[in-house]
């Protein structure tokens, strides 16, 4: 069995139904369920007595009140059921397109939601768990293009992925692991329609799929890969044509280029849903051996289809106007990561600070740790092994011993800098700092008290800011002087924090519109880290972050200048096209 041929005319005749179905599912999730579950999670967190949830307080949060923890578990399980239902509704809709029975738009929706209700009544924990694991882990392509909100939160932050990819053998191991997951997904893919569409247990559905793919793994892997490739090719080819047209339009007057840009934005969104429809129909047709029916055109149906498409185009046009005409909702601050830019020296050293300050970033982010003798030194890592080749912690050596050590990075060699020297030189250069306090179990109990007593006045006078992963640091700073801006670093976007921090420094790959909207409502600032790629930059601009922490200051500055002074609509459309696919890091 292979994929059935799918004529473009038949696909076009059903595009309006797909648009209608996705619009309804989107409205239910975006404006009903996501706000509700977000409110519920925040309410439960408040009952624990904690203001935030992060890796360093998760155990304390979930052990604070067992009744609340039970409610957290229930909310988590309900969200899994909602994700299962969201996928199921879409599958039922596509299945109804493959039926031989012709339906009106209302009949299509009625049948889809009726079948989805039956599917939900048949749901069992084993079915939900299988679908969540399949879509969330084994075949993440599905959850990405279908934009399954809660499954898309199952991702590894980009800074961890980048680290793993930079380790040669780990990179190879990850590639092999991803290939194995794909092959497992192929072995189990025929179980998916059985679970959704038939009243059989998961065990039998899995056995059916294993039997069907036995000794034909490469055959089915090729067919699934071909469906994915053709779907993405349709989208990519359409986007290339639109971008080519927009490049020409950008040479004309701004009014003409903006008008054509909005028109291309509409076509891009339609191309995305066309690609999505193509993939879903081909995928389910492949799994069920059913083809999309070619019904005779009824009188009046083109008008209804035209009306649905017209409304969709008007919505897309409004979205396109906002996206293209206001590419930068806020002008983000440019922040050098660890005091370097484009590998211009060794991180967290005075020599690199002097070079980076010439680029005039708004802030230079740097890292401070306590030493054995209660002084403060510039160091990011928990040990000295990477930079100095010594397996010691900064807290195990005195400041004098540390500043005598040679450190190496990016082809440069220098000495470790003390915080006193670094701060003094930054003040001389007129360079504001974003001072990150790194804490450890070896720190003295009065570390922050001594730090603030010695440096707080200078930090305030020169307009420096502070940040930390440790919320005790945030509390100490605010108790000492509420006028010092201090940011709480969050490596992962979970429950929205309700803290007294001036703002949040968030790992960019887990950021989403829901978090940013709440930031604006709470009158806090948002910094994103670490932004080094075109996709990450585009996402940060789109979300409207207040600051961008980067390893390449000049690149971010040029990107901001271009969007402010001479925005190229072709570039914006290209960024949006990538964003629509919603792959990790976008």
Language-model-detected regions and their locations in the chain:
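Hydrophobic alpha-helical membrane segments
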Residues: 1-334
